[in-house]
């Protein structure tokens, strides 16, 4: 299946099975926001749980925080966001739609292998294909404004955070002192951020409200490059360990002239989404932010955010290595990479097309489905009791509707690793049939061994 059709198919699957809904759909929806349904929120939470386990609880040198969405306005002035967090905006004189000029230029270069000789004049309108007819680029702020207090005036002006990082930086000293940490160490945060994107789109890839998984790792100057490479390698391996095919991932080195104002070096981990205009899309950036953040916040707040190294009797401002990942983008990637179509036998002796999400078991929204072979009262008590017992450990679905093959298909397409069938023999032999998602192999397991059988195969879930 072509990759673009996988995007369309996955989007339809998400809407049909309750992973993702258009925000405010009864009012026409919006391209810039999506709601996560029952299965979507489980997948999202499982991704966050694996990130937190990898980045925080499995390491002795990283701790977590949960910082406010609305910070003092001066934080964003000092960090440079108010001044430089802008994008070049152009308007098509054909359709009067607005686009980021840098995105148009990048897409042209990726398609043709070279930048446009005449700049924007060589770029056709993305919607109509007409020869380019563009306004001059204008600076467009990516910050979303809000007002606190009874009057919408300058005094009450605040910003919704465009990144979680600044909340970490302003708490650097608090965390270092209360947690008795010292560089090299990291502070992690998962939370909502907001950016006034000019052209949100590509499903949940680019939205104005999104969730980030960020960690700021504070190191001694001079050790930053080694730690930067460590986190590039570690983060790339995290995606592979969770089942992403290595050939669908790549590292993209930001050219020096395109680095953010705080960055010494930035490397993106990208996935082959195969969007209409570009093959690769950024999953996360790993940036060497130097000492920029702690230095400017020391100057802006008057608070000393340096570190005194007692071993060397030196005082220095830590450099920061930042792996920053987008949760929605990660979820979209896991769904696309796991989507698979094959054939499964049906009750008539033939085969049917089977859709299966081959998600890593740690990510699967539902871990086990309990399926009584019949709705008859003789099976119901045992099946319901079994489902209740398994729910103490995992997210369990209980489905009694339709033929057993159809119920298997329903679980396959949401990625459920194991289906447990309670049949009439179960009443006699106290055993159930356990079916594995990917191989469709079935084994008979005694009821008193079922919990241990599943636990061995759901480690880390």
Curated annotation (Swiss-Prot):
Similarity annotation: Belongs to the class-II aminoacyl-tRNA synthetase family.
HAMAP family found in the cross-reference section: Gly_tRNA_synth_B (MF_00253_B)
Highest taxon, organism lineage: Bacteria
Function: Catalyzes the attachment of glycine to tRNA(Gly).
GO CC annotations on file: cytoplasm
Keyword annotations from UniProtKB, A to Z: Aminoacyl-tRNA synthetase, ATP-binding, Cytoplasm, Ligase, Nucleotide-binding, Protein biosynthesis
Record's catalysed reaction(s): tRNA(Gly) + glycine + ATP = glycyl-tRNA(Gly) + AMP + diphosphate
Residues noted as binding ATP in the record, renumbered to the chain: 195-197, 205-210, 282-283, 326-329
Gene3D superfamilies reported for this sequence: Anticodon-binding domain, Bira Bifunctional Protein, Domain 2
Pfam families: HGTP_anticodon, tRNA-synt_2b
UniProt binding sites for substrate: 100, 163, 210-214, 322-326
Major place of residence: cytoplasm
Protein's UniProt name: Glycine--tRNA ligase
Species annotation: Corynebacterium glutamicum (strain ATCC 13032 / DSM 20300 / JCM 1318 / BCRC 11384 / CCUG 27702 / LMG 3730 / NBRC 12168 / NCIMB 10025 / NRRL B-2784 / 534)
Single Gene Ontology BP annotation: glycyl-tRNA aminoacylation
GO-annotated molecular function: ATP binding; glycine-tRNA ligase activity; protein dimerization activity
Known EC number: 6.1.1.14
Subcellular localization, as worded in the UniProt entry: Cytoplasm
Quaternary context: Homodimer.
Keyword NAD: no
Signal peptide interval: none
């Amino acid at each position: 299946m072509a990759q673009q059709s996988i995007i369309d198919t996955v989007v339809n699957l998400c809407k049909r099975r309750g992973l993702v809904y258009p925000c405010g759909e009864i009012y026409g929806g919006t391209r810039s926001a999506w709601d996560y349904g029952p299965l979507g929120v489980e997948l999202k939470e499982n991704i966050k749980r694996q990130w937190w386990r990898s980045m925080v609880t499995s390491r002795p040198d990283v701790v977590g925080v949960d910082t406010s969405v609305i910070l003092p306005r001066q934080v964003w002035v000092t960090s440079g966001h108010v001044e430089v967090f802008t994008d070049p905006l152009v308007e098509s004189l054909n359709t009067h739609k607005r686009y980021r000029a840098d995105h148009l230029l990048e897409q042209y270069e990726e398609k043709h292998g070279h930048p446009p000789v005449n700049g924007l004049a060589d770029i056709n309108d993305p919607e109509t294909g007409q020869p380019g007819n563009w306004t001059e680029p204008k600076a467009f702020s990516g910050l979303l404004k809000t007002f606190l207090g009874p009057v919408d005036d300058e005094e009450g002006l605040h910003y919704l955070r465009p990144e979680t990082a600044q909340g970490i930086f302003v708490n650097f000293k608090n965390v270092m002192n209360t947690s008795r940490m010292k560089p090299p160490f990291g502070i992690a945060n998962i939370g909502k951020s907001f950016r006034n994107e000019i052209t949100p789109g590509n499903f949940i890839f680019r939205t104005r409200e999104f969730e980030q998984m960020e960690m700021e790792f504070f190191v001694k100057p001079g050790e930053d490059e080694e730690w930067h490479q460590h986190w590039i390698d570690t983060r790339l391996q995290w995606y592979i360990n969770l089942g992403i095919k290595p050939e669908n991932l790549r590292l993209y080195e930001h050219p020096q002239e395109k680095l953010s104002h705080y960055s010494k070096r930035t490397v993106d981990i990208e996935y082959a989404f195969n969007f209409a205009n570009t093959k690769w899309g950024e999953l996360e950036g790993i940036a060497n932010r130097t000492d920029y953040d702690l230095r400017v916040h020391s100057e802006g707040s008057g608070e000393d955010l340096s570190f005194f190294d007692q071993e060397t009797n030196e005082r220095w401002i830590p450099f920061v290595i930042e792996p920053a990942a987008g949760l929605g983008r990660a979820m979209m990637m896991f769904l696309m990479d796991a989507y698979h179509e094959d054939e499964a036998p049906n009750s008539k002796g033939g085969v049917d097309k089977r859709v299966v999400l081959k998600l890593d078991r740690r990510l699967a929204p539902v871990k086990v489905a309990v399926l009584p072979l019949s709705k008859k009262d003789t099976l119901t008590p045992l099946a319901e009791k079994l489902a209740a017992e398994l729910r103490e450990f995992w997210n369990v679905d209980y489905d009694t509707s339709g033929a057993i093959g159809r119920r298997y298909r329903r679980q396959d397409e949401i990625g459920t690793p194991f289906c447990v069938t309670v049949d009439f023999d179960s009443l006699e032999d106290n055993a159930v049939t356990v079916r594995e998602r990917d191989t469709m192999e079935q084994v008979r397991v005694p009821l008193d061994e079922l919990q241990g059988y599943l636990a061995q195969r759901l480690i880390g879930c």
